[in-house]
Amino acid sequence: MDIWMAFQALILGIVEGLTEFLPISSTGHLIVVGDLLGFNGETATAFKIIIQLGAILAVMWEFRARVLGVVLGLRSEPRAQRFTFNLLLAFIPAVVFGLAFADLIEHWLFNPITVATALIVGGIIMLWAEKREHAIQAESVDDMTWKLALKVGFAQCLALIPGTSRSGATIIGGLVFGLSRKAATEFSFFLAMPTMIAATVYSLFKYRDILQWSDLPIFAIGFVSTFIVAMITVRALLKFIANHSYAVFAWYRIAFGLVILATWQLHLIDWSTAQP
């Protein structure tokens, strides 16, 4: 196994694990870091699909007790039934819009201006959502109504726009629609499970021809590093938001958006070969 490729896989796995569940756009970070490391092409595309599985498993493991409780309580527990209904309801809009518009959006909007604009605008909205005075309608995910869940589901559709960030769209949407920070964050994590599984399965099918068994060691390094770092990140974020706002992430989004514009203007990143 090539040592340099193993190092690239390790670094990108760490980047994915750090950024997937923070509202700062994992796609944008993987593009920038991947280009700086010279990790592009078909192998890179397949690699990004595989390491998402590591992130999915990390959040499922972190919430395994709740997931198991919901599964076991589906037949008789009203709380588990309501939670599952809300989750599926929030999941549907992304499926419909994704199947209908994902390829068009990828073709027309995957460019540095769109990515940077989405990062900056998302950061500004996040600052506004944190500063505005509003009544909390749901302190926990169990307090959510189906209407709140559906609203967050539609907010998740904005993540189809490159640079928006799936977690960013759902967390910001949750805050805007009246969820507490804790509820918005946890619901974002739970909604990530079906959404990312569906997106990964779709991507695996779409890019099935470029998956090679010879790349398995590289994929394994990225997968494991993503899983470990994502699990640490999820735990750290839940502790952080208990006593802090999302303002630091908002300012980071704005700064990173400006970095994206700079890399484009100065031709530091080859956006013509970048893949979402």
UniProtKB/Swiss-Prot annotation:
Bacitracin is thought to be involved in the inhibition of peptidoglycan synthesis by sequestering undecaprenyl diphosphate, thereby reducing the pool of lipid carrier available. It is an enzyme of class 3 (hydrolase). This is Undecaprenyl-diphosphatase. Catalyzes the dephosphorylation of undecaprenyl diphosphate (UPP). Confers resistance to bacitracin. The chain crosses the membrane at residues 12-34, 43-63, 85-105, 108-128, 185-205, 218-238, 249-269. Keywords: Antibiotic resistance, Cell inner membrane, Cell membrane, Cell shape, Cell wall biogenesis/degradation, Hydrolase, Membrane, Peptidoglycan synthesis, Transmembrane, Transmembrane helix. It catalyses: di-trans,octa-cis-undecaprenyl diphosphate + H2O = di-trans,octa-cis-undecaprenyl phosphate + phosphate + H(+). It is found in: Cell inner membrane. One of its GO terms (molecular function) is undecaprenyl-diphosphatase activity. Belongs to the UppP family. Its EC number is 3.6.1.27. GO terms for cellular component: plasma membrane. One of its GO terms (biological process) is response to antibiotic.
